């Protein structure tokens, strides 16, 4: 069945050489830069960075600069300096700036750039990252794209700056699929939607006629698996984002819930409700449609999430009374409980880095978003309140997105928080929003 509502194509429109470093622009610093951010030492002071308006024939250069600055500021690692403090006016972004003018305003890094329209209609975006106190250029790159894709250029540049200054991959050139919620609480319409990670470019990918929940990206970013109540009983579907084609993932007699892809994209793990009221975890191989049962308890086993290498699965089970977190082999072997704190645990999701598991915890009348090591040690709650739920990892494993509902009237909203728990930001959406899932970096 085709959902002919919105073209959600996410294949890059950049030319093959778009993200290559132009030889004429590169001037790399020595192996150890003077300016850098150590993101492994916990709470840090944001790095003051000056981002000048990219030279262009219209407003586009300023628009791109604004997106870059917003990306970096939202990470909590950078403090973009107000443009009113700038002393030097950049007229040639390729030339070395007057470093003393930037040191005076404590700009430890400087970004300059240019946007030009090519004869074929494409845009050429060039940028340079300067170490002002070291007096050297750190990187210079150029990209080509279509005019309607300018926001992606901004996100890619922000990722390049983030990576050069932190040593970690960025996460700005990504998308988030989520459940859009509109209408009164008693008749809430829930549609699947997709957007850029900063809340821009929202597009709907389901029509809202049937309740749709728990969307999850495939590793190739081209597919989403989700649960739909079409026909009255929840079933798991697979949606092709580029074409709108969708298919049922197994025509099981009972309800199927909580789907998620394996890291190689070849399997979907999900829970099937049994006649006795229990729920067990199954996988379906998408290549040959064979199913494998992984758990066989009388409990409710759900919320399965693979480790990045595909060798293990974390899931929620109430086999011990309250819902707790368990880890087992990807074949269902050796299940063991890892959560040992008070309260109930749910919605576990393994970090892309493999070092942590994020979760929702309900305890003492509050819902919290937390992380723990994969053996259950080192539990930390990042944020707590009336209702926080459904964490999803940025692809670099440094930031989480989740949804929050405040007490009283209203509905859920999306937020991000870093691993320090100090940098929490709301993501603006057109309506109420829940169940976010972060994509891998786009290509």
From Swiss-Prot:
Gene3D superfamilies: TolB, C-terminal domain, TolB, N-terminal domain
Keywords, sorted A to Z: Cell cycle, Cell division, Periplasm, Signal
UniProt-listed SUPFAM superfamilies: TolB, N-terminal domain, Tricorn protease N-terminal domain
GO cellular component terms, A-Z: periplasmic space
Protein's cellular compartments: Periplasm
UniProt key word Ribosomal protein: no
Signal peptide per UniProt: 1-33
Domain of life: Bacteria
Biological process annotations from GO: cell division; protein import
PANTHER family per record: PROTEIN TOLB (PTHR36842:SF1), PROTEIN TOLB HOMOLOG (PTHR36842)
Family recorded in the similarity comment: Belongs to the TolB family.
Task performed by this protein: Part of the Tol-Pal system, which plays a role in outer membrane invagination during cell division and is important for maintaining outer membrane integrity.
Subunit structure of this chain's protein: The Tol-Pal system is composed of five core proteins: the inner membrane proteins TolA, TolQ and TolR, the periplasmic protein TolB and the outer membrane protein Pal. They form a network linking the inner and outer membranes and the peptidoglycan layer.
HAMAP family: TolB
Annotated protein name in UniProt: Tol-Pal system protein TolB
Organism annotation: Brucella canis (strain ATCC 23365 / NCTC 10854 / RM-666)
Record lineage: Bacteria, Pseudomonadati, Pseudomonadota, Alphaproteobacteria, Hyphomicrobiales
